[in-house]
From Swiss-Prot:
Belongs to the MinE family. This is Cell division topological specificity factor. Prevents the cell division inhibition by proteins MinC and MinD at internal division sites while permitting inhibition at polar sites. This ensures cell division at the proper site by restricting the formation of a division septum at the midpoint of the long axis of the cell. Transmembrane segments: none annotated. One of its GO terms (biological process) is cell division. It comes from Pseudomonas putida (strain ATCC 47054 / DSM 6125 / CFBP 8728 / NCIMB 11950 / KT2440). The keyword Cell division applies. HAMAP family: MinE (MF_00262).
């Protein structure tokens, strides 16, 4: 580093590093706005398979909702059972 670079401050970033930094910000922002975790669809599928062992239900008959209240997460499972 020469004396002029020291007084100019940081060197210019390359366009690749700027693009990478912007992409990281976008990904972090998208993750923060996501309301459901990654495992929720798989959990719904597995629960549906277990319930189908005992009751004949369709995919639309099971609704899973995850709600955050402070430091607690509440998993709500609603199953519409067929009439006997």
């Amino acid at each position: 580093m020469n004396l002029f670079d020291f007084f100019r401050g940081r060197q210019k970033q390359t366009s690749a590093s700027v693009a990478k930094e912007r992409l990281q910000i976008i990904v972090a922002h998208e993750r923060g706005q996501r309301s459901e975790p990654d495992y929720l669809p798989a959990l719904q599928k597995e629960l549906l398979e277990v319930i189908r062992k005992y009751v004949n239900i369709g995919n639309d008959d099971v609704h899973i909702e995850l709600e955050n209240q402070g430091s607690c997460s509440i998993l709500e499972l609603n199953i519409t059972l067929p009439d006997r």
